[in-house]
Regions:
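Short, basic, alpha-helical segments at the C-terminal edge of helix-turn-helix-like DNA-binding modules
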Residues: 35, 65-71
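Helix-turn-helix
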Residues: 16, 20-58, 62
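C-terminal peripheral helix-coil segments that are non-catalytic and often amphipathic
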Residues: 1-2, 137, 141-145, 168-218
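Amphipathic alpha-helical packing segments from all-alpha helical-bundle domains
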Residues: 89, 103-112, 122-149, 160, ...
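Solvent-exposed, amphipathic alpha-helical segments
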Residues: 16, 20-27, 70, 74-78, ...
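Short loop-to-helix capping motifs
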Residues: 55, 117-122
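Hydrophobic alpha-helical connector segments
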Residues: 62, 75-108, 155-165, 188, ...
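Secondary-structure edge/capping motif, primarily at the C-terminal ends of alpha-helices
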Residues: 79-82, 119, 176-180
Length: 218
């Protein structure tokens, strides 16, 4: 078996373990989850899990990294999009992708369970902190290095703005979970509006124009 095939097979097996762990978290939460639970969910052996992960925290880190990669992909791809319409229209389409991703019910339950564990588990808290820092670094560097971008915003301020936008999305997850009777269609629409307006407000201030003027830019 060649190295490429071996690597692909190993990655598929690793992914199956991560997905089994996510299903376990959705069922019973993270705090009492054991590797034996994950092996049972996967239909494999405990020894097979140890071939890929030394402990539960390493699996949690893999779950967090996968979510972070997903968020970065949406952000970077949206930043490179040069579709038709105004800046405001393209930004709205971009923010819609974020909101829909964060309103995914399964992903929300896993993310909230991990966040709850981070409150009492310092290692999990460090995993989330490192993932967040990587997220802000990648996105802010992408914006700064994009030759088509001319927003004169200092990197530290940009990262603070990213953190606040992310906090709205994280809060959206919690709201959807703990307010099951809320109109999700309205919640989605309001979240998109708030994100679009907030980002346009930050950018318009750096350009010395109004939000309305900036939203009409090509």
């Amino acid at each position: 078996m060649n190295e490429v095939l071996c690597g692909s097979l190993a990655e598929r097996r690793r992914l199956k373990i991560i997905e089994a762990a996510e299903r376990c978290v959705m069922k019973t939460g993270l705090h009492r989850l054991t590797l034996r639970d994950i092996a049972r969910e996967q239909g494999g052996s405990l020894g097979n899990i140890y071939n890929y992960f030394a402990n539960k925290e390493e699996i949690v880190e893999a779950i967090v990294e996968r979510e972070t990669d997903r968020f970065i992909a949406i952000a970077v791809q949206g930043g490179k999009a040069q579709g038709e319409g105004t800046l405001g229209e393209r930004l709205r389409e971009h923010m819609t992708s974020f909101v829909d991703a964060y309103l995914d019910s399964d992903g929300a339950r896993v993310a909230v369970s991990i966040a709850a564990e981070a409150m009492i588990n310092e290692r999990v808290r460090d995993i989330i902190a490192r993932a967040n820092q990587r997220l802000y670094e990648v996105i802010s560097n992408d914006v700064i290095n994009n030759r088509q971008n001319s927003w004169p915003i200092p990197k530290a301020k940009m990262q603070a703005q990213l953190a606040l936008s992310r906090s709205l999305l994280e809060g959206l997850r919690v709201t959807a979970i703990f307010n099951p009777g809320i109109d999700r269609k309205e919640l989605r629409a309001v979240a998109i509006d708030r994100l679009v307006h907030g980002i346009l407000a930050d950018l318009s201030a750096s350009k010395g124009v109004t939000v309305e003027e900036l939203s009409r830019w090509p």
